[in-house]
């Protein structure tokens, strides 16, 4: 009877340890997703900044990104988005955002010791996804757009700083 009980406990331990990802596998996936997240965040920030400055210049100077006269800021933003499309930056941000979300969802079977890390990372990814949409589909007026992008960027930066402090050993430098 003891042998059967010992066998069952051993078998259960083996099965439990084989379920889910290993910590090293999770850390690899985290680092890959983290790198894509940073690319998405950085590119979105550059794009949001360019949108804001173009919008501002169109309203106050009546100029498009190429310096042409415009009486409507929508003309300037259309020209800017045409430039973004030609350069591929809009598609890149959308693709990185999709990749970031896909990689993050693949990490959902995190080891117990990494569950908090995963949950915190999901929170950051959600904010970065929202920020990337602000870059690819601006809305509102110039003031609200600037307030929203600035607030979101600062929020993301704060969360990333906290994430780096809490999970420094999981992220490769």
Model features per residue range: what roles?
Residues 20-25, 112:
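Acidic/polar low-complexity scaffolding segments in large eukaryotic proteins
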Residues 67-93:
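Polyanion-binding interface signature
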Residues 1-2, 20:
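N-terminal hydrophobic targeting signals that begin at the initiator methionine
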Residues 15-18:
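C-terminal motif of bacterial Sec signal peptides marking the signal peptidase cleavage site
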Residues 26-77, 114-173:
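C-terminal amphipathic alpha-helix
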Residues 2-10:
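Sec-dependent signal peptide recognition
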Residues 86-121:
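Mature extracytoplasmic domains of secretory-pathway proteins
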